[in-house]
Amino acid sequence: MTALDTLATALGPHGDLRRDERLARHTTFGIGGPADLFLTVRSSEALAFAASAAYDAAVPALVLGSGSNVLVADAGVRGLVIDNRARTEQADSTGLTFRVESGASFAAFARRMCRLGLDGLSWAVGIPGTLGGAVVYNAGAYGGCLADVLRRVRLQIPGDGGEWVDAADLGLVYRGSAFTRGQLEGKAVLEAEVELAPGDARDLLARAAAHDANRLAAQPRGRNAGSTFKNPPESPAWKLIDAAGMRGMRRGEAAVSEKHCNFFVNEGNASAADVAWLIAEAQRRVGEQFGVTLEPEVQFVGAW
């Protein structure tokens, strides 16, 4: 019996388990090869068990969330991919602090808070992905970021139970954290606690609607992973990519969006290799022409 077989037996009672699941079905890019094991969980306890079981079996594990902000290799992912659908939320006695499981839709939670007249997340209503992913990448837009309202997170510790960690200890920076720098490798976000402020629901919903309208006008609606690159200090990434002559450039069925050059889109049956080529070409051109290094915001996942 292989390590994967042993792990599959252990995971069976804790979620919906599939073998060789094509990850293109589970990413906003619509790109990605198969996962050896693919487990859908619906509670933070099941997520913690799965991550710990994979650790004990020495099988690599990846928490996928909603599949945004990632480019999964055509060869897929070896080991276990956990589809996190843990979405329970609970308010404290003040009604201002919420404990939310990491598989909750970040945008839906933000919009719900606006409707309740709670201020701090109106900027997030159009951001794809889960709350867990928002923690890992310190999601932000329109002058706000999750670090502004995040108090602490509960992490799954390999070979152990959950542990609450203060937000100040997560190394949150622009579109990154200790997770993205590899300093918390192997630790999964189980829950997050956010603290909001009293506000006016009508005003917050108006702000959210304005952000929605801006995104609709400026960003492509097709299959993509969100912003491809972080914005460097010198200039917004889209301006540099545009100036480098890449607006609308294609490779296979992958393309640089005509509407917003920092969005790379899947226009049919694009391969991860074609998207990766466009990313590398943008880095090369911008580096050679402007002396600026573009750092990907999208994460490369799997067997590259």
Predicted regions and their residues:
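Anion-binding (especially nucleotide phosphate/pyrophosphate-binding) glycine-rich loop
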Residues: 2-131, 135
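Structural signature of FAD isoalloxazine-binding scaffolds in flavoprotein oxidoreductases
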Residues: 32, 39-44, 71-89, 136-167, ...
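Short, basic and Ser/Thr-rich N-terminal targeting/leader segments
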Residues: 57, 64-66, 149, 222-223, ...
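Residues embedded in well-ordered beta-strands within globular domains across many folds
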Residues: 81, 122, 154, 298-299
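N-terminal short leaders/motifs
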Residues: 104-111, 140, 177, 183-184
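Short, well-ordered alpha-helical segments in soluble proteins
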Residues: 113, 131, 135-139, 154-157, ...
